[in-house]
Amino acid sequence: MSTLKDNKVGVNYVELEGVSLLTLLEGVSSHASTDKSLPTLNAVHIESEGGLFKAKATDRYRLIEGSLLSVDGRLEPSLIPLYDIKRVIALCKDHKANRVQFSRIGDTITVSSLGDAITFTVSDGTYPPTEQLFTDSEKEPTAIDSIAFNPAFMADYAKIAGKKAAIKIYFTGAGKPMRVRITGDTIKWRALLMPMSYKD
């Protein structure tokens, strides 16, 4: 006889702490493209396997991934439009002290907590591969004379890190992405930022 837990796993179900999920999605969604003509990038990619829930987003100029421990279940890779991610964030704000559940059946995901629920359809686009970019950024840092970047992006990192927290930047070469290290209590962050062209 199958157990309730077996049934949850069978239909793609994962459960997370509301406050941690809120922090994760607020941070990751800040890096999603706001260009609705790019539906694959105007979205957040999520998945959960082996007790680890991951979310990532990119606008082509920066890339971020955050991961946290899940309470229960698994969820196959799913691309969620930014509009719907904002709805999930709103639900999490109302349930920071509670657990939040994701349940996927087919192309439909329902996010719920204590009777409140929203349902939406996942995007059908193919998310760009990102793991190799993160792997390449882990190589030995290099010394460079100077680098230009968008300061507004750094402000987003400051919000993710929290008040009085430091972030650390690693340079991997001229014209290559900078690796941004953000330390979190419950979330493990990985972030990359492309330099800008600049003429003196």
Predicted regions and their residues:
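DNA polymerase processivity clamps
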Residues: 1-200
